[in-house]
Amino acid sequence: MKVTIVGTGYVGLVTGTCLASRGHRVACVDSDAHRVATIARGAPPFHEPGLTELLGSALRDGRLTVGAALEEAVADSDVSMLAVGTPSREGRIDLSAVEAAATAVGRALGRREEYHVVVVKSTVVAGTTDTVVRRALEAGSGRPAGAFGLCMNPEFLREGSAVADFMRPDRIVVGCWDARSAAVLDELYRGFDCPRIVTSLRNAEMIKYAANALLATLVSYSNQVAALCEAMPGLDEETVMTGVHLDRRLTPVDGAAGPAGIVTYLRAGVGFGGSCLPKDVDALRGLAAERGVATPLLDAVMAVNRQRAGQVVTNLGAALGGLAGRVIAVLGLAFKPGTDDVRDSPAVALIQGLLAAGASVQAYDPLVRAVPALGGQVALPPAPEAALAGADAVVIATACPEFRSLDWQACARAMRQRVILDGRNALRGVPLPEGITYLRIGLGAPAG
């Protein structure tokens, strides 16, 4: 099939590239000329394992093109996917980019006769596709929905494994205006072997939010367990949660399958972040407030998450006898390993707390080269050893695998004081030199 992707951000470019690799002909459209030029050279504007190779192959084979001409792309395609951003504004998502994209696609539809399906890939609250998007398409095209197709097809891509997630999805959810729209999406995803849900537009929108809210809840639940373990002698959150994970309702017991993926969210740390979970939970709370529905559980999820980085700062200050004038090394800046995304990263919140307490910070992440939110207040040396040089303590804020293989003997010699606060329990089991004070998340004092 011929597919137009409107927006070349994370979702748009991964979706377009992967569809092209599955044999479809894809035109990615973006109004950012610099971004278009970068992608046309085969260079994704963000880090995602496997994407560069797939993109280069699709460009060379002519299965994927990138440009700014939306009308021409829509005129020559069967499906248009809206994959533009929906940033959060005080607990409400900003739909201006979605509405503008739908209006532009609508105008293009008004100039063609053939049936065309518009698919919303952007994460939007329930009721958006059949109101905001539909009305913009109808106004732009001068035609009613049904004359063109309309679907909501949420993405479930995890940064750091998005290509694999797209190619081997655990489910495909399609919300549709009518059966004809659904049939086109069924053809688009032919060959994908996974459960499919064909439902209403609003159910499809809500499935995405409900899924992300559950994951966020698991993280905050684990951090509440960790806080209690830290407050009581003899408790260890990692051991406690390992025992929880082994419940057969969470982990298969057939001897072949490993732990279910969901238990990876049942681990304590410095909190959740990124472009999805915080924004989506807040948007769900905002939608509920508009309808007069109380959300005490989701309110608590966000409150716990906001507190977590501050608690880590407090714990470190207690270990050092204060933070004013201290030099703190922070390892990890992205919100999770395997990505360069620092949006709403707990590591950034942690660093801001350290700076507010009077510490100076030098930070390292294997993929991150700049953190605009920190405004140049933090040194970003090119190697982890340089970040640790002269530090009073090191905080591990992101569980990057390479941190386990550092020469911790040499790192300890380079530090002024030898304190490690492992905010992700990433070094558990790693031999550390004598004389290091190693503090883990969720570990209480020794039992008397």
Where are these regions (language model features)?
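Structural/interface elements that position substrates and couple domains in central-metabolism enzymes
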Residues: 1-448
